[in-house]
Every structure is written in structure tokens, then in C-alpha cells.
């Protein structure tokens, strides 16, 4: 009797070959999916990697704000919180901006339909009534499947979805969210965090000289 071979015999049946081909295809597809996910995560890894649209319909790369601290806010013109928030936002922008800090305002009509106007009307109202000097972008959606990708990044980062107008996210110079505030929280509660980030930015610039 011949001794058994220490190596497994090659399987040459048609079914085995089909299985091997199918398994190879599944494996390759899986690897491609993983690589694609890694690429997408790298591309959208911070707030400043996105593009948005301004009130005049022009594309704006948020990368222009990289290196600054940004307070991102969903604004509305006809909300009980409108006046107090617009005034406090402009106050913060005047105090800490524009070199190291900026407010980024995104009108949204998803809360109480309190922002029904056109982009032109919204921007004009903000400048006329509250003297805003910070950017007011085009009206967006921040909830649901049609949410603006840049805003979805803020929500995903904090696991906190805005429940009303004037929800605020503080973004650091690298595009990561460091804190958020609800509409009823005053500028006084926001100021220390903004001041701290701005100090860090100034100190880093001095060190890099």
C-alpha cells in the first residue's frame, strides 16, 4: 500500500473552480470597499474640507477658514431668538475676528418655517437690522437625507442634532468640533471658549515665527 501524500490533492472539479473564482471576486470587492471608505473618510475628515454656497450662489471652499476658530450657526430671520442671537454673534465676531475667528451663518427654514425668505433677502436683513459683518451663506437643510454635508459633519462629530434655530458649533483651526451651545445660551457662556481658542492660535503663530 502506497503512503498517503502529505499534501492535499488539488481539487479540479468545475464546482470547486467556480467557488474559488466567486470567493476571489468577493474578496477583491471587499478590499475595494474598505479602501473607498478610507478615502472618503480622509476627504471629509474635517469641517474645512467641504464646500458650500454663499448667498450669491457662488461656491465657497471652507478651507479658506482653516487656521481660524469658527462658530457655525443655523440662523433664522423670524424666530424669537433672532435679535438676541444676531446681536451677540456680531459682538463676538467684532471682538475676536476676523483674523483669528469668524462666525459662519447658515440660514435654515426647517424649524418653525422661520426663514422663508430668499438668500438675498436674508443677507440684506442681517446686515440692515444687525450690522453683521460675518459671512451669511445660502439657505440649507441641516436635518434629514438632504442635509448639507458640511453640517452633517458637525452633527456626526458631536452626536447632537440641532433642535431649533441658532444652535452653535465651535470649530477649531484644524476643522474639528470642540463644543456646541443651544439657542438660549448667552454670548457670555461662549466667549471664554472662543477666547481660549484665539489665544492658542496667536501663541502658535508667534512660536512659528
Curated annotation (Swiss-Prot):
Active site: 79
GO CC terms: membrane
Source domain of life: Eukaryota
Gene3D superfamilies on file: Glutaredoxin
Classification via InterPro entries: Glut_perox_Gpx7, Glutathione_peroxidase, GPX_CS, Thioredoxin-like_sf, Thioredoxin_domain
E.C. no: 1.11.1.9
UniProtKB keywords: Membrane, Oxidoreductase, Peroxidase, Transmembrane, Transmembrane helix
Catalysed transformations (reactions): 2 glutathione + H2O2 = glutathione disulfide + 2 H2O
Name of a matching Pfam family: GSHPx
GO biological process, one term: response to oxidative stress
Gene Ontology molecular function: glutathione peroxidase activity; peroxidase activity
Membrane topology per record: Single-pass membrane protein
Spans traversing the lipid bilayer: 18-40
Subcellular location(s) of the protein: Membrane
UniProt main location, coarse: membrane
NCBIfam families documented for this protein: gpx7 (TIGR02540)
PANTHER family: GLUTATHIONE PEROXIDASE, GLUTATHIONE PEROXIDASE 8-RELATED
Family: Belongs to the glutathione peroxidase family.
Protein name (record): Probable glutathione peroxidase 8-B
Organism encoding this protein: Xenopus laevis (African clawed frog)
Amino acid at each position: 500500500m502506497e503512503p498517503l501524500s502529505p499534501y492535499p490533492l488539488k481539487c479540479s472539479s468545475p464546482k470547486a473552480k467556480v467557488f474559488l473564482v466567486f470567493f476571489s471576486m468577493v474578496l477583491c470587492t471587499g478590499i475595494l470597499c474598505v479602501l473607498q471608505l478610507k478615502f472618503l473618510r480622509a476627504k471629509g475628515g474635517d469641517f474645512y474640507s467641504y464646500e458650500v454656497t454663499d448667498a450669491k450662489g457662488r461656491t465657497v471652499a471652507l478651507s479658506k477658514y482653516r487656521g481660524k476658530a469658527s462658530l457655525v450657526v443655523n440662523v433664522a430671520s423670524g424666530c424669537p431668538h433672532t435679535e438676541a442671537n444676531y446681536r451677540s454673534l456680531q459682538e463676538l465676531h467684532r471682538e475676536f475676528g476676523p483674523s483669528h475667528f469668524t462666525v459662519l451663518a447658515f440660514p435654515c427654514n426647517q424649524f418653525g418655517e422661520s426663514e422663508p425668505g430668499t438668500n438675498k433677502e436674508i443677507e440684506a436683513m442681517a446686515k440692515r437690522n444687525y450690522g453683521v459683518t460675518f459671512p451669511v451663506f445660502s439657505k440649507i437643510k441641516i436635518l434629514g437625507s438632504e442635509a448639507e454635508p458640511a453640517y452633517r459633519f458637525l452633527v456626526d462629530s458631536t452626536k447632537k442634532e440641532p433642535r431649533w434655530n441658532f444652535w452653535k458649533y465651535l470649530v477649531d483651526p484644524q476643522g474639528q468640533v470642540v463644543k456646541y451651545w443651544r439657542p438660549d445660551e448667552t454670548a457670555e457662556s461662549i466667549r471664554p471658549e472662543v477666547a481660549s481658542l484665539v489665544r492658542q492660535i496667536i501663541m502658535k503663530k508667534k512660536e512659528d515665527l
